[in-house]
Amino acid sequence: EELRKLSNFKISLILNKQNYGIGGSFKILFNYLKSKDFSYWINLQSSGRYDASQVLSNLFEIQSTKTDIDYYLHSRFLKPEDSKKYNFIRKIANHFFIRLTKICTNCNFSDPGMSVFMISKKLSTVLLNKEFTQLTNDSHFPHFMNVVLYKYLKEYKEININWKEGNVKSHLNSLSYPVLLLINLINFKFKGSFIKYNKKNEFDYEKLDFDKIA
């Protein structure tokens, strides 16, 4: 029903000229949205891991009664039954890194690696700050973004999401991903920031390499 309502809206597609990774694509989106007029924007990415229409319905229902909340973050781990169909090893690894994230960064999200969220226009302006644009362009970006964003939050709400294995094989490397996450969290603990791997992570927003099709 919610998706049918959205069908009447104008849809813009941003087609990147190359693969910038999830972090790079987020940064391009942040810059694109800065001149747009809206109250909130929603990020959905799934590969069949959850019911997107149910997520939208929940967000619209909750937001209609709460106007002072800047950030709504979905969590796989608020209720045990929400991750029953999720890979057991990945679930254990997630719980380990969630606890480690709290210890190293003081970020108290129950699922800091989650990238299904709704954010207000007011709060999203901070996403153009250097501490976000200098984050990695790779798959760790949502986790790092949530950690850095946490300190800006006055009011936020976590919403449970029913999560399962998707219909597309995970692209995450089971060895390098946790190792790099561990190194970055330790770096944050002692230096107060994540590792800046190289200059290419920070986009020149005046020279973005993408085609926008409305």
Give each language-model segment a name.
Residues 1-14:
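Acidic donor-binding segment of Leloir-type glycosyltransferases
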Residues 3, 58, 145:
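Aromatic/hydrophobic pocket-lining residues that form π-stacking "cages" and hydrophobic walls in ligand
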Residues 5-8, 35, 66-67, 151-153:
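Short, well-ordered coil/turn elements that cap or connect secondary structure elements
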Residues 7, 130-214:
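Hydrophobic helical membrane-anchoring modules
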Residues 10-12, 108, 155-157:
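Conserved beta-strand segments of alpha/beta enzyme cores
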Residues 16-35, 40, 52-135, 139, ...:
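Acceptor/aglycone-binding surface of glycosyltransferases and processive sugar-polymer synthases
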